Swiss-Prot record:
This is Small ribosomal subunit protein uS17. Signal peptide: none annotated. Keywords: Ribonucleoprotein, Ribosomal protein, RNA-binding, rRNA-binding. GO terms for molecular function: rRNA binding; structural constituent of ribosome. It comes from the Bacteria. Part of the 30S ribosomal subunit. The lineage of its organism: Bacteria, Pseudomonadati, Pseudomonadota, Gammaproteobacteria, Cellvibrionales. It comes from Cellvibrio japonicus (strain Ueda107).
């Protein structure tokens, strides 16, 4: 048997909530073309991601990767923080 390494899916989005312990909510937006009319529009989805060190803050741009289910709704894990939000 040959072992093939599975490549985890990664997405980039913005942190919209960090109120939970070791969990962040990430808003992922993508541009989609309408099949009939050809107009581009924005679709978005929110995912819960595991943040082991509680280092993310609201407004940060992050990369998350698919992982095994960690809870009922949490199946993504934080890979890295791309850009920090401005301190107010």
């Amino acid at each position: 048997m040959t072992q093939q390494a599975k490549v985890a899916r990664t997405l980039t989005g913005k942190v919209v909530s960090d109120k939970m312990d070791k969990t962040i909510t990430v808003l992922i937006e993508r541009r989609v073309k309408h099949e009939v009319y050809g107009k581009y529009f924005t679709k978005s989805s929110k995912v819960h991601a595991h943040d082991e060190k509680n280092e993310c803050r609201i407004g940060d741009t992050v990369t998350v990767a698919e992982s095994r289910p960690l809870s009922k709704t949490k199946t993504w894990a934080l890979v890295k923080i791309e850009e920090r939000a401005a301190e107010v």
